[in-house]
């Protein structure tokens, strides 16, 4: 009786381990397929990025003189500052979207951006990126909502010092 019980428990354990290892293999295969599909998409994105990074020679730089030839690797696109601003906005857009209720509450309690800066504990030289992005998001929210007709004449909307 004891021997049959031990054999049954052992076989059940081995069967459970075999099924678990089979299911892990299936998951790994599907993850590899997903990654390969993602890599296909990434190559298209990388091609577009390379296209944007190309630098075109000006009419003045057409000479073959090595002093006048510029290296295309070191050349930067003209819209670099705009691209960096867009990427920064994308980076903090999730934070700003999640803070909309906070912005609404601050605005309903008639807090100016200066009051919000004090509430967040920001100073001129502080390096708190998340709090700075929250503050910048509120400044945008404040400017947008103070431009509405019903809010223009409110005292806290007339404050222009941030």
UniProtKB/Swiss-Prot annotation:
It comes from Phytophthora infestans (strain T30-4). Keywords: Host cytoplasm, Host nucleus, Secreted, Signal, Virulence. One of its GO terms (cellular component) is extracellular region. It is found in: Secreted; Host cytoplasm; Host nucleus, Host nucleolus; Host nucleus. Effector that enhances P.infestans colonization of Nicotiana benthamiana leaves. Induction: Expression is induced during host plant infection. Belongs to the RxLR effector family. Its main location: secreted. This is RxLR effector protein PITG_06094. Residues 56-88 are annotated as: Disordered. A motif (RxLR-dEER) lies at residues 51-91. The lineage of its organism: Eukaryota, Sar, Stramenopiles, Oomycota, Peronosporales. Residues 1-20 form the signal peptide. InterPro entries: RXLR. It comes from the Eukaryota.
